Amino acid sequence: MATIHKLFKSPFFDFEFLRLLAMAPYEGAEIGEVLEAAAKIKDQDPESWYSTLLETGGKAEAIAKQAEASGDRVGARRAYLRSSNYLRAAQFMLNEGPIGHDERVLPTLERAIANFRKGVQYRDGKTIFLEIPYEGGKTLPGYLYLPPAARRIPGRKIPILLNSGGGDSTQEEIYFVNPAYGPDLGYAVLTFEGPGQGIVLRRDKLPMRPDWESVTGPVLDHLFDLATRHPELELDLDHIAVTGASMGGYFALRAAADPRIKACVSVDGFYSLSSFVGGRMPGPLFNGFMSGWLSDWMFNGILGVLKKLAFQARWEFNHLRWATGSTTDADVMRSFGAYTLQKADGTEYLADVKCPTLVTGAGASFYFDPATTTDKIYDCLTSLQDGVDKEKWIATDVAYGGLQAKIGAFGYSAQKTFEWLDQRFGIQREPLAASSRLEDLVSRL
C-alpha cells in the first residue's frame, strides 16, 4: 500500500487538512494559499486552525470581490468557492460546549454559505436554490445543479443524482465531489442538508435521525413537484440515483429502498454506527458500557479523561453530542444503536433495496474496516444478484480512494461513480480520441 506525505503529525489534523486540499481540482482550494496556511497552523490546536483559515478565507473573498468588480466571472467563481471552503473548514474544529456556545461558529458558516451561493451563480450551468418542506413546518436547504446546455446528453432528459451529506460535512463542501463533476457529463445533481447536518444543525439545532428515508422522502417529493411545475427543466424522474460517503453512504442505503430511486452508490458507508465506534474505542471501555457493567457516571468520567488526552476523541464526541442532540457522552453511546441497517425484528433493511447498488470501501481508512462494513453491506443486499445488479469496489492506495470517503481521490471517485451510473441508466458515450490536427479541430466547430 502506497504512503503519502504528511502535513501534520497527528492523523486527525492531517486527514482533515487533506480533506480541504483534496478540493483544489474543483476550485475548492488554491495550492499556494493552502500550503501557506498549513505552515501557520499548530498541530491539534483548534484556535490556530480557525484563525489561520479564517484569514485565508477572507483573503480569497477579497480576490472574489475584485474579480466581480472587473467583470471576471471565472475569477469570481473560483475565489468565492475556495473562500467558502476555507471558511467552512475554519469553523469545523470549534465545537466545545453545546451548540451556540462558541459564537464564532454560526456567523463563520453563514459567511461561507453566502460566498458559496455567489460562486455557484457563476457556473456555466444553472444552480437552483431549494427550500424543501420538512416536518413541523421546517424547511431544508438544497441546491439543484443543472448541466450546461452544451453538456446535455443528446436525445434524453436529464438524469439526476441525489447526493446526501454525511456526519460532519456541509452540502457546500459536497459540491466539490459530484456536483462539480456530474453536470459536465449531462447529469443534474441535487444536494441538501438534513437534520444533524451543516446549517440545519448549527442554526436550527435539529438533531440527526437514523431513519434517513424519512428525510430523503420529502426531498424526492419536492424534486417531483419541481419537475412537474417546471417541465422545461426536462428532469428525468425515471432515472434518479442516490449517493453519499461515509455516514452519507449509510444514508444513501436507507434512501435506496424508495422505489423512486433507480440506482445507489454507497461510498465507504457503515452497517452500524455501534460497530464503528467499537472499533475506535478501547475494548474494555466500549464493552463495559454496552454490557451495562459501567454506569453512566463511570463511563463519562473515564471518557472525560481520554478526551483531555486526545483532541480527536474530544472533537468527535463533542460533535456527536451536537448531531444526536445528547447531553452526555453516555447518551451519545445509547443513541448509536438506532443507526443500523438491521431492523428491530432482526431482519435486514438492505433486503428491501431493489435497485442496482455499488458499494465501496476504503482499505486505508482509520475509521472503518472493509471486512466489517463494505463486505457486510454487500452480503446483506440479498435482493440483488452478485456481479449483476450489485457490485463492490474496495480501494487500497490513497491516491485511488483508499482513505475514508475517498478523501484525496475525489476526481477518481466521481469518475467511477458516473461511469457506473452510465451503465445502469443505459447512457452510451462515444469513445474519445484527442487530436490536434487543424482539420479535426475545425470540424468540431
UniProtKB/Swiss-Prot annotation:
<dbReference type="InterPro" id="IPR050261">
    <property type="entry name" value="FrsA_esterase"/>
</dbReference>
<keyword id="KW-0378">Hydrolase</keyword>
<dbReference type="GO" id="GO:0016787">
    <property type="term" value="F:hydrolase activity"/>
</dbReference>
<protein>
    <recommendedName>
        <fullName>Alpha/beta hydrolase psoB</fullName>
        <ecNumber>3.7.1.-</ecNumber>
    </recommendedName>
</protein>
<dbReference type="InterPro" id="IPR029058">
    <property type="entry name" value="AB_hydrolase_fold"/>
</dbReference>
<comment type="pathway">
    <text>Secondary metabolite biosynthesis.</text>
</comment>
<feature type="active site" description="Nucleophile">
    <location>
        <position position="246"/>
    </location>
</feature>
<dbReference type="InterPro" id="IPR000073">
    <property type="entry name" value="AB_hydrolase_1"/>
</dbReference>
<comment type="subunit">
    <text>Homodimer.</text>
</comment>
<comment type="similarity">
    <text>Belongs to the AB hydrolase superfamily. FUS2 hydrolase family.</text>
</comment>
<dbReference type="Pfam" id="PF12697">
    <property type="entry name" value="Abhydrolase_6"/>
</dbReference>
<comment type="function">
    <text>Alpha/beta hydrolase; part of the gene cluster that mediates the biosynthesis of pseurotin A, a competitive inhibitor of chitin synthase and an inducer of nerve-cell proliferation. The PKS-NRPS hybrid synthetase psoA is responsible for the biosynthesis of azaspirene, one of the first intermediates having the 1-oxa-7-azaspiro[4,4]-non-2-ene-4,6-dione core of pseurotin, via condensation of one acetyl-CoA, 4 malonyl-CoA, and a L-phenylalanine molecule. The dual-functional monooxygenase/methyltransferase psoF seems to be involved in the addition of the C3 methyl group onto the pseurotin scaffold.</text>
</comment>
<dbReference type="GO" id="GO:0042438">
    <property type="term" value="P:melanin biosynthetic process"/>
</dbReference>
